[in-house]
Amino acid sequence: MAVGSRLAVLFSAALAFVGVSSVLTARPAVAQATVSVACGSVGAEFDLCKTGAEAWSKKTGNQVKVVSVPKDSNEQLALFQQLLSQKSGEIDVIRIDVVWPGLLAQHLVDLSKEVPKDVIAQHFPAIIEANTVGGKLVALPAFTDAGLLYYRKDLLEKYGRKPPTTWQDLTESAKIVQDGERKAGNDKLWGIVFQGRAYEGLSCNGLEWVDSFGGGTIVDGQGKVTINNPKAIAAIKLAASWIKNIAPEGVLNYAEEEARGAFQSGNAVFMRNWPYAWALSQAPDSPTKGKVGVMALPKGGAEGKNTGTLGGWNWAVNKYSKNTKAAVDLAKYLTSPEEQKRAAIEVSFNPTIPALYKDKDILAKNPFIGELLSTFTNAVARPSRVTGSKYNQVSSEFWNAVHETLSGKSQAEESLAKLEKTLTRLSRNGKW
């Protein structure tokens, strides 16, 4: 089936589902408004959203229609783009990825005019900034993610190594532990695994390397292409030096789960991944249970900084909604401290409200979450906001340039110089 036809089917199915999946209020007898919300696909996230929408419905007397959308995030985006381009108000509240605001901003309500400033100020500033396009706040944060470093506590202790503070420390420790274990007969062990496949995950890893060295964010906040600089080159060169040295060549085709599989099976000393991998590494049947530490990603040298690429999801309101006031109220409710606390306790989602990282109930359920506060505070956003509708092209060019360097097809200097020229043409000299 052609892509256009498939999206048309998905679009029709989504709208049909709106009509049959109403969550009715108990009182009052006549609802004040009817609001439709796209709750993601099946599973814990969908159930969490549906339960929250039902609670809001009972609290306000409004009626809610819950919509299930495709599981694949790219198909979700395509569906929303098709719906919004038609100026359809069929779905009032939509859940969007942190890199979508620039792509969808023209179709979304400016929430800075609808939501009190003190409510907005509760959230991590970096996430609010990522959701702000052209001075308009187009989404409220629901939960967040950022890259982390996982390490084998037992192996570092065995070889007298401390958790690394810089990427250079990590490179040295990975080599020492890897060589020592291989001499002892563990020839499957590697020093580090990460997301090295040519896809969005490599853009996240590459941005972390570059930003930790002080090499910028590919494109700065004013739209200028900044990727071709000595610090960025040094960062990518260091990562390239890992391949076949302390990282398997196969890492060039690893996404999140391949990296987690290698690490959790006991075949890596270090791993870069998202917070979700923690609970899995500590499962009762996990070979690494009780052996794993987690920390902020290392600095790019003494003058560098800890960082982690910002991830997560947010709630936005369709500009073409016929029930804007009620839709905004639902978005506020779904991103409230109460709902974020429930999400943290029930499904271990990471709140976007710093105060919740000290909440006793959340910490009792998930002690690990308290260690994430500094990571989310220092998270770096991908340049999706400033590059707008061209972000996907920017990211693709970046991950391909990094992948070519990691695979040895070109040197970092050559790759980033070529990337700079490509992005400058794409940006029309900074005018995205």
Question: Residues of each region from the PLM?
Answer:
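Short, solvent-exposed loop/beta-turn-alpha elements that line the ligand-binding surface or hinge
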Residues: 112-123, 129, 182, 190-199, ...
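Extracytoplasmic/periplasmic solute-binding protein
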Residues: 138-142, 147, 171-224, 268
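Short, well-ordered beta-strand elements
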Residues: 32-43, 62-68, 92-93, 138, ...
